[in-house]
């Protein structure tokens, strides 16, 4: 193994000098290990990643953990390969850090477990699937108005407390239960508390055994936060390429990936670009996003929570992410206040899959009519607020009447929330979703009360609920 010595420490950046021209390659992992000298001291076990060749037999590296205690002259060993992490079934139900070390309270992953390097090429053109296939989620508002594509990338927008985590959990649950699929969750620059809560909530709801979790928390150095998304993606790729699975890959939050890259870029001395971001922003984002795709064997479908700095959608970080997205799911606080869950905004959410050649003519026509009805209702709300319903024409009254039923019917109970609500969760196939809304638009259920449509699954449940309310059906 090639050995070198630490020549300079600049916070999370460490320069290492190697002898006799034995320079490690870019992205190679370098280890610095030193046992504790006494009981009161903590030993050093640090992994670095080579970022630059500076010349004079010296490389500049980024630390994957704190550099506390690292001194000039310490021995550093080139491992001869990039950071490699465990892949396969051993990762399910477990929590890892950026290096693939388990950080849950269970036994360490077996030493002989298969490992893959986190830096890999995106699938070549001949490996890519040319078919556009819809990923059925069982969530009505998503499947009808902003359907997800297998191997696609979805942006999940929403503030604090509007239900991003519950939506993520329900998607993990539905993919596991209905499709037998696997999920990988990457917490990038996450609050440790949120990651901890998510792990225990998923354990309680029973979906953890179909999920691998990787965390690079907010308090960790930028190197760890920048690479943790690649660690999660490497685990997801194995399930796709080796096991032929349709994998869900969650990134929360993709903005933190960019933010960490910006910090690393500044530490490496690169000239900043627009708004202080790294000049390699588009390249780094592309390298990550291009690996998320459908192949002839399986697919990795990514759902990415996106923080928008100061609500400025022209900021380079979110703007670069948008270029890669196939669909957006926007969560709206006003809907949570109305008791509509999931609080997905049916007018702001979009998908390029909502086209007649992909979803079919009937689905497309119903979805567009639902949107136009809700849009007209939105336009009429100001008039209703000022003058009241009585001032509307008969046609507009009918629009409002149906729009409110549609709005309530877009809600449903979630399986993962059963323990809180006491209501059984529902999974609604796309065909039944389309049929239900088609019948509402045709006026078949105009005589039923609005509350019968709230938090139900199939349209038959609306009729049952109305009967329970004492309404003649």
Swiss-Prot record:
Catalytic reactions on record: ATP + H2O + 4 H(+)(in) = ADP + phosphate + 5 H(+)(out)
Membrane topology: Peripheral membrane protein
Localisation per UniProt entry: Cell membrane; Membrane raft
Source organism superkingdom: Bacteria
Residues in the signal sequence: none
GO molecular function, one term: proton-transporting ATP synthase activity, rotational mechanism
Transport as UniProt keyword: yes
A Pfam match: ATP-synt_VA_C
Enzyme Commission number: 7.1.2.2
Gene Ontology CC entries for this record: membrane raft; plasma membrane; proton-transporting ATP synthase complex
Main location: membrane
Binding, ATP: 158-165
PROSITE patterns: ATPASE_ALPHA_BETA (PS00152)
Keywords: ATP synthesis, ATP-binding, Cell membrane, CF(1), Hydrogen ion transport, Ion transport, Membrane, Nucleotide-binding, Translocase, Transport
General function of this protein: Produces ATP from ADP in the presence of a proton gradient across the membrane. The catalytic sites are hosted primarily by the beta subunits.
Assembly mode: F-type ATPases have 2 components, CF(1) - the catalytic core - and CF(0) - the membrane proton channel. CF(1) has five subunits: alpha(3), beta(3), gamma(1), delta(1), epsilon(1). CF(0) has three main subunits: a(1), b(2) and c(9-12). The alpha and beta chains form an alternating ring which encloses part of the gamma chain. CF(1) is attached to CF(0) by a central stalk formed by the gamma and epsilon chains, while a peripheral stalk is formed by the delta and b chains. The F(1)F(0) complex interacts with SpoIIIJ and YqjG; YqgA is found in the same complex.
Family of the protein in this entry: Belongs to the ATPase alpha/beta chains family.
Name of protein: ATP synthase subunit beta
Organism name: Bacillus subtilis (strain 168)
């Amino acid at each position: 193994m090639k050995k070198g010595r630490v020549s300079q420490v600049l916070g999370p950046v460490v320069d290492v000098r190697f002898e006799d021209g034995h320079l490690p390659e870019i992205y190679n992992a370098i280890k610095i290990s030193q046992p504790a000298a006494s009981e009161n001291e903590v030993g050093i076990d640090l992994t670095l990643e080579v970022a630059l060749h500076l010349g004079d037999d010296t490389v500049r590296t980024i630390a994957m953990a704190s550099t506390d205690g690292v001194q000039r002259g310490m021995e550093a060993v080139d491992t001869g390969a990039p950071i490699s992490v465990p892949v396969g079934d051993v990762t399910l139900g477990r929590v890892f850090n950026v290096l693939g070390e388990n950080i849950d309270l269970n036994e360490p992953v077996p030493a002989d477990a298969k490992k893959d390097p986190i830096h890999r090429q995106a699938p070549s053109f001949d490996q890519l699937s040319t078919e556009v296939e819809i990923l059925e989620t069982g969530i009505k508002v998503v499947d009808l108005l902003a359907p997800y594509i297998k191997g696609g990338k979805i942006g999940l927008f929403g503030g604090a407390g509007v239900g991003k985590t519950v939506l993520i959990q329900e998607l993990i649950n539905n993919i596991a239960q209905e499709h037998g699929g696997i999920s990988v969750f990457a917490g990038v620059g996450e609050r440790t508390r949120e990651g901890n809560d998510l792990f225990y909530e998923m354990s309680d709801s029973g979906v953890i055994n179909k999920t691998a979790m990787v965390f690079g928390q907010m308090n960790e150095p930028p190197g760890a936060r920048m690479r943790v998304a690649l660690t999660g993606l490497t685990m997801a790729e194995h399930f796709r390429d080796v096991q032929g699975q349709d994998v869900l890959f969650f990134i929360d939050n993709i903005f933190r990936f960019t933010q960490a890259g910006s910090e690393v870029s500044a530490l490496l001395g690169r000239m900043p670009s627009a708004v202080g971001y790294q000049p390699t922003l588009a390249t780094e984002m592309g390298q990550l996003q291009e690996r998320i795709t459908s192949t002839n064997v399986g697919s990795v479908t990514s759902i990415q929570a996106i923080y928008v700095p100061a609500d400025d959608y022209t900021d380079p970080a979110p703007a670069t992410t948008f270029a890669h997205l196939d669909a957006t799911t926007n969560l709206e606080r006003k809907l949570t206040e109305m008791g509509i869950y999931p609080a997905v905004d049916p007018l702001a959410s979009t998908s390029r899959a909502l086209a007649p050649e992909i979803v079919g003519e009937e689905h497309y026509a119903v979805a567009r009519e639902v949107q136009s009805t809700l849009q007209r209702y939105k336009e009429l709300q100001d008039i209703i607020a000022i003058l009241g319903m009585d001032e509307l024409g008969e046609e507009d009254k009918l629009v409002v009447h149906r729009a409110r039923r549609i709005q309530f019917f877009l809600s449903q109970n979630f399986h993962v929330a059963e323990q809180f609500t006491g209501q059984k969760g529902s999974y609604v196939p796309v065909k039944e979703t389309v049929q239900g809304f088609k019948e509402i638009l045709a006026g078949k259920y105009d005589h039923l009360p609005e509350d019968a449509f709230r938090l139900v699954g199939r349209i038959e449940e609306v009729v049952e609920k109305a009967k329970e309310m004492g309404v003649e059906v």
